[in-house]
Amino acid sequence: KIGSFLHVLTAQEANYLQELALNSPLKIPVLIGIDAIHGNALVSGTTVYPSPIGLASTWDDSFLYSIGKQTAKEMRATGSHWTFTPNIDILRDPRWGRVGETLGEDPFMVGNMGAAMINGFQQGDFTGTQKVIACVKHLIGGGESINGLNAAAADISVRTLREVHLP
């Protein structure tokens, strides 16, 4: 009855959960996901990178690709298959509480750097022992919340939607 676990922190815990799943009547492996927005930072002993807004200041797509690739390798070593990153919301209000998770305010840069990170995580088809599934977040216009309040209403004109969020 359980199909996935979030934030499993050790390989031993992941192996135990997989063992339980494989001994169940359906024998379907469990999908394990973790929020690895700047490396697999929730897991002890893994590489922790600067927050995405800091990484974006490099303007170096290949650097974000390599971070995605290394993070995927460390995630798989601890039993995870799926990451809830990158955040490709376009930063529109610096008061927003998720600024650090974003890749900035420039749609071109966010698109390129987000794609590089996704490609690093998945390395083409995301099958294999050193690749993970990237879950891009959030919704279009997520960085447009009124007064910078997370999950608040957004007032987005068609022009802003087309020029900023759907270039």
How would you label these PLM feature ranges?
Residues K1-P167:
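Glycoside hydrolase catalytic-domain context in secreted enzymes
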